[in-house]
């Protein structure tokens, strides 16, 4: 029998959310490398932040500078990377934040495992569905070139599969339309499910 028990705090998620005037959620941006996940998530965070919302963006590269710096890119390490991020995101949502996470997260099992940690409605899957051909053309880090040469193993979309979501809450192809309209679609969705109050966005415009 474990001696570790959960300590119930006197201040809960609902109280923190009320103080911030928002409903905490996790927006999980998934898609191929170069699909535009970080760009889209960053633009949304900027719009929400400027309107006075309390946010935090977890980025796939950034967490490997600290939280996950001990991990490589084997299947086991990539799974552990996402497990840690999911737990951190859960703590941040409990703190009352609107959390944005931008990770390739190639398998449905990984994403569904993270979704299962949250109450219904608090995990919003955003499939950034930009086609592989466009992602390769962009190749901002030169990774596709290396993967095609065989210099990178288990590279998602080339030598390792990407499992597209079957029922994502939102699907956005960043090769269609402009960034502003894509951010608008995300904000409209968050407004519709009452995560944010649209009057605050209007006031900040």
UniProtKB/Swiss-Prot annotation:
Under CDD domains, the record lists:
APSK (cd02027)
GO term, biological process aspect, one: hydrogen sulfide biosynthetic process
Q: Which InterPro entries match?
A: APS_kinase, P-loop_NTPase
Molecular functions per Gene Ontology:
adenylylsulfate kinase activity; ATP binding
Q: Provide the E.C. number(s) assigned to this enzyme.
A: 2.7.1.25
Return the Gene3D superfamilies for the record: P-loop containing nucleotide triphosphate hydrolases
Q: Part of which pathway?
A: Sulfur metabolism; hydrogen sulfide biosynthesis; sulfite from sulfate: step 2/3
Q: Return the HAMAP family for the record.
A: Adenylyl_sulf_kinase
For this entry, the protein name equals Adenylyl-sulfate kinase
Q: Which organism does this sequence originate in?
A: Shewanella sp. (strain MR-4)
């Amino acid at each position: 029998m474990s001696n570790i028990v959960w300590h119930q705090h006197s201040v809960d998620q609902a109280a923190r959310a009320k103080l911030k005037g928002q409903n905490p959620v996790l927006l999980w941006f998934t898609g191929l490398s170069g699909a535009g996940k970080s760009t889209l998530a960053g633009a949304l965070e900027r719009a929400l932040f400027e309107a006075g919302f309390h946010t935090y963006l977890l980025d796939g590269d950034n967490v490997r500078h600290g939280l996950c710096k001990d991990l490589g890119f084997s299947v086991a390490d990539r799974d552990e990377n996402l497990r840690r991020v999911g737990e951190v995101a859960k703590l941040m949502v409990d703190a009352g934040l609107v959390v944005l996470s931008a990770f390739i997260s190639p398998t449905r099992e990984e994403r569904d495992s993270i979704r299962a940690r949250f109450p219904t409605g608090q995990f919003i899957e955003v499939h950034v569905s930009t086609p592989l051909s466009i992602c390769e053309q962009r190749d901002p880090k030169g990774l596709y070139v290396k993967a095609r040469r065989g210099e990178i193993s288990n590279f998602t979309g080339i030598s390792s599969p990407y499992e597209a979501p079957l029922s994502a809450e939102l699907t956005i192809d960043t090769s269609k339309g402009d960034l502003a309209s894509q951010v608008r679609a995300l904000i409209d969705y968050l407004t519709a499910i009452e995560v944010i109050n649209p009057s605050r966005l209007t006031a900040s415009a």
